[in-house]
């Protein structure tokens, strides 16, 4: 069988052995080697997909790169990857732990880009505050996990009834209350308010927002000083000029205005 996995440079998929192996950030991986072998990388949004070849078992990508700076796919990049995977017989995996469950304005971010992955990974918001992870794929793929060996033997807490109930109810509320659609209106409000000379760019897809500052130090001061004023922001892993804004989908317009007021007051003090 095939063992080669293709991931993207500056990707982040987690901190456990397998997910760290496919993350594209060497300085965070160095202390934990040896990791999984036969991992190769492509540039996100690059047209050269030759690394995906007949030895490739799967390609794993974030639909929107998070730690790299909230980088959205351009020029039909995901469609090209999907077609390349189909050509060589590899599976396309999309990691939507950050982008899924309504955050980008659709239930799943891949819906913006006219493709469907072979395997979809979910977590974080799916549990509504409870720890949960999910792998979603078609039945024929799941059937492959029924033998040699059966997948079920490797999980201690898999399918926990309380967490499964929390996940079901969270998904139901997101769909019933149309929270995905409402994120676009809230995104527009953020972008309308967050105008300042120290902000060079606002990257956003729904309520997945990154403020790109003039330099690392400005970003660092904004996060720390905002926390002192009661507002939680955060950094991104690789893009040090960026400040993350990823509030709950239920955030109100008045809360958005209050938060933006704090951000602008901090920037005025820098």
PLM feature spans:
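Conserved N-terminal phosphate-binding loop of PLP-dependent enzymes in the Aspartate aminotransferase
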Residues: 1-270
